[in-house]
Regions:
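Exported/periplasmic ABC-transporter solute-binding proteins
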Residues: 1-174
Length: 174
């Protein structure tokens, strides 16, 4: 249906068997985002997993203030959510926060509650999207395992939550 596609995940074996090729174009990292008033500036991969599993529920458990953690997720089919599910491996994410949205004739639809910069909030997004495209004000990225998500640390692979971004083409298509 198209000549070129983009993906934040590698091709599955069955997709390759259908004649698709993948070429790495760039790398991006999943940035962990918190409210700028949050005193936590670094989280371990283990603690991020525990937060999103629901085992750590208060910032004081990771060196912050005595405040409930509000862990936001991305919609199920988004690239950053797919990356987070991959990162979590066999550990399932806890049920996401949801909002009920009213859409005229469709009635009420439940949607995943995406990051809102409120006290206690934590979220994640591709670093480039957060810092380069949206330039969200009033939120801060934090380090993971002591490494801040810079272009250099992502490109070198030093930052621990990195994914290649792929160009997908059809074999033999010039």
């Amino acid at each position: 249906r198209c000549d070129i596609g983009l993906s934040s995940r590698n091709l599955k074996d069955e997709e390759k068997a259908k004649g698709l090729n993948e070429t790495i174009l760039a790398y991006d990292g999943i940035a962990v985002i918190v409210n700028p008033e949050n005193t936590v500036s670094d989280l371990s991969i283990e603690n991020i997993a525990k937060i999103y599993k629901g085992e750590i529920t208060n910032w004081k458990e990771v060196g912050g203030e005595n405040e409930k953690i509000i862990a936001f997720q991305r919609p199920e089919r988004s690239g950053s959510q797919s990356m987070m599910v991959y990162f979590m491996g066999d550990t399932p994410l806890k049920e996401p926060l949801t909002y009920e949205m009213e859409y005229a004739m469709l009635g009420i639809i439940e949607e995943v509650a995406q990051y809102h910069n409120e006290d206690g909030a934590i979220g994640y997004s591709f670093r480039y999207y957060f810092d380069g495209m949206t330039q969200v004000e009033g939120a801060k990225m934090i380090a993971v395992d002591g490494v801040y998500p810079t272009t250099e640390s992502i490109t070198s692979g030093e930052y621990p939550i990195v994914t290649p971004l792929y160009c997908i083409t059809v074999k033999g298509n010039q």
